[in-house]
Amino acid sequence: MTTTDQILALAAHPTATTEADAGLARFAEAAVAGMNTHVVRALRALRPADDGPAWRAWLSATAALSAPGGAAASGAVPSGAAPSGAAPGGAAPADGPVVTTVVCAAATALGEDCSAAVAAGLQAAALAEAGLATAAGWSVPVVSAAIGAGLAAGLMLGLGAAQLRSALGICATQAAGLRAAAGTDAAPLQAGKAAFNAIEAAQLARLGFTSSREPLDGRRAFFPLLSS
């Protein structure tokens, strides 16, 4: 079973978890605390009007990570793993601040009842992270969060298996983020953009956009590219 297949298996029976609920609570508090940071003000200056859920996810994730005392403020980009709720293949749900923020931002921008989608997204991010052990130079939390957030967004939009596969591929082809950005304004910005891209990918998949059937493990796909 490929990593993409393992992630899609998570979508079959998504279940709310205490880890997801706790992550959502932390995210909501941090997003409010960071909404007046200079990074968020700069983003708002580019698009002063509400520009849909993807834009709201970008703003909220950036706000949460640029809040005073947040992960970006300290220059940290940890990922970590929760001790319970293992995903297929043995990966525990990723619950580092960057991963959790990106997944929660994507899910909450699309609805309120999102604990199950967030739980599945955190597990998907952990599976993506496990394949990026040698991704030197890349911000592994950000690029793996893009995959997890894509699954969460797809679940919130009610996508079927084929559409979810396409959404994951669209996320993978746009995944980016540099370790060198840690401690700068670009760190929360690139994490927020991952949440934006995740929602956009799910929306495009719902409209019929396609992508690689094996966007993660394929010979010219996500893992080989980022680990080269």
Model-identified regions with their sequence ranges:
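N-terminal core-entry segment
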Residues: 1-228
